Amino acid sequence: MSLHRVLSIYTRAGVTATASPFFSGRVADRASNMAAHNFVPFITNKREKSSGVGLSALAAKKPRVPRQSDSKKPSLVIFDKDGTLICFHSMWVPWTKQTTLKLNEAANLDISHKFYKLLGFCPVEQKVKTGLLAEGTMEQIRQRVVELLVESEVPRASAEQIVHSSVLDCNTSSPETLKQIHDLQGLFKELKTHNVKVAICTADSRKGTMNALQSLGLEKYVDLVVCGDDDGSLPKPHPHNALSICRVLGVDPEDALMVGDTLADMGMGRSANLGTVGVLSGVGDRHELHPHADHLVKHVGELMPLLLGSTQNNQNNMPSTN
């Protein structure tokens, strides 16, 4: 599904939001109002979309500045998926190992070490660190693996075929690998009780994302989903997707919150002028996220007290869990 198509849906006569799986009924009801306000989608840059270099560095460029609305309950929370809602390691470590075996066999080379380094996977700790796998889209990963094979003297045409057959989407619906970090249905229900909209912005594919949400019974609670392979999507930390979500849902970025586990998540939120909450349940650790998040929490289960102001989860006095 095209993000550009979804975002431009309000400017095309005779088309309603119910035609898109992005939307729940609540959002569909707003379609006519959005059209009346001449909603125009953002213009995207394909070259910028394909660039996957230095995501963490980009995210870390801009120092965190306190916002006037930090103490106000948000109208919208945008969640990253893997590492924030779903255990990153239980899903992507098996994928990394299986993909490595496929690449080695197809290329008749042992590129395990290079592939692990490219992705940010530590075979000793059996964990994914900050890097391409944690922050990039599948398109970016495939492009970089092609270049890795070419650098290993594999002809480009062969490298592209190897990647096409070996670097496949992750099976995100398997109960063996799909492990939610918290009671997500309970969390999303509580957000809805307090009239807070819910969106998900992930680098993962749409197929994998929707499979995961359906397996966990979450799709009915989510107002908008933006994925890495949606046409018109730009990778984090670019602010495009966050600003697009805010526009579609009719929320001022100042009244929205980005929740994620990587510098790319924090960078997207900050560059779009959203509040930012870093979670220590995924790839990023306290030392990475601390300078760039308005708040740090151990996991999304600690989010509601923070949003409602019943406890003060100050990032400067919270102990690290890493």
Description of each model-found segment:
Residues 2-9, 23-76, 185, 189-190, ...:
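Asp-based, Mg2+/Mn2+-dependent phosphohydrolase catalytic module
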Residues 16-17, 21:
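Long, low-complexity intrinsically disordered regions in eukaryotic nuclear regulators
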Residues 54, 58-185, 189-194:
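N-terminal helical cap/lid subdomain that shapes the substrate entry/recognition surface
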Residues 84, 202-204:
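Conserved phosphate-coupling serine/threonine residues in phosphotransfer and NTP-handling enzymes
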Residues 176, 201, 234:
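Glycine- and other small-residue-rich loops at beta-strand/loop junctions that grip anionic moieties
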